[in-house]
């Protein structure tokens, strides 16, 4: 096992700790999934691809997964952390009108 593979594996375990802290069931399930995937690809002919994939998984977990906790009023409290990727909706707002086109004057036949 290469040091790069071991480093990618450890990074994935750290990513689960960041993403799923205080949720032991999900944390343990995520770690088991990573461990199983790592073991399955241990003797792979495409080791470099597997390392890249593991690093991408780590990055995705840390930057895109947030925990939500249901509050008494039925709303969810989202637990963002300092590495959570926060985007704005400007690109969505800009493309929305262009993609929708104009519905003004659209006619439909009713049968």
UniProtKB/Swiss-Prot annotation:
- Record's keyword terms, sorted: Chaperone, Mitochondrion, Transit peptide
InterPro entries given in the database record: Complex1_LYR_LYRM7, MZM1/LYRM7
**Top-level taxon:** Eukaryota
Cellular component (GO) terms are: mitochondrial matrix
Q: Where is the transit peptide?
A: 1-13
Report the locations given in the UniProt record. Mitochondrion matrix
- The question of whether Transferase is a record keyword is answered with no
The record's principal subcellular location, in a coarse class, is mitochondrion
GO molecular function, a single term: protein folding chaperone
Assembly, in brief, is: Interacts with RIP1.
Q: State the family it belongs to.
A: Belongs to the complex I LYR family. MZM1 subfamily.
Protein task: Assembly factor required for Rieske Fe-S protein RIP1 incorporation into the cytochrome b-c1 (CIII) complex. Functions as a chaperone, binding to this subunit within the mitochondrial matrix and stabilizing it prior to its translocation and insertion into the late CIII dimeric intermediate within the mitochondrial inner membrane. Modulates the mitochondrial matrix zinc pool.
Name it.
Mitochondrial zinc maintenance protein 1, mitochondrial
Q: Which organism is it from?
A: Meyerozyma guilliermondii (strain ATCC 6260 / CBS 566 / DSM 6381 / JCM 1539 / NBRC 10279 / NRRL Y-324)
Lineage runs: Eukaryota, Fungi, Dikarya, Ascomycota, Saccharomycotina
């Amino acid at each position: 096992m290469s040091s790069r593979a071991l480093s990618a594996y450890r990074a994935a375990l750290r990513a689960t700790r960041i993403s799923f802290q205080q949720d032991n069931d999900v944390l343990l399930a995520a770690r088991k999934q990573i461990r199983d995937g790592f073991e399955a690809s241990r003797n792979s002919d495409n080791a470099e691809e597997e390392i890249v994939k593991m690093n991408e998984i780590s990055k995705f977990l840390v930057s895109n997964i947030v925990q939500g906790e249901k509050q008494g009023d039925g709303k969810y409290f989202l637990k963002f952390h300092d590495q959570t990727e926060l985007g704005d909706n400007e690109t969505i707002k800009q493309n929305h009108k262009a993609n929708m086109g104009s519905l003004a004057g659209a006619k439909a036949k009713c049968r």
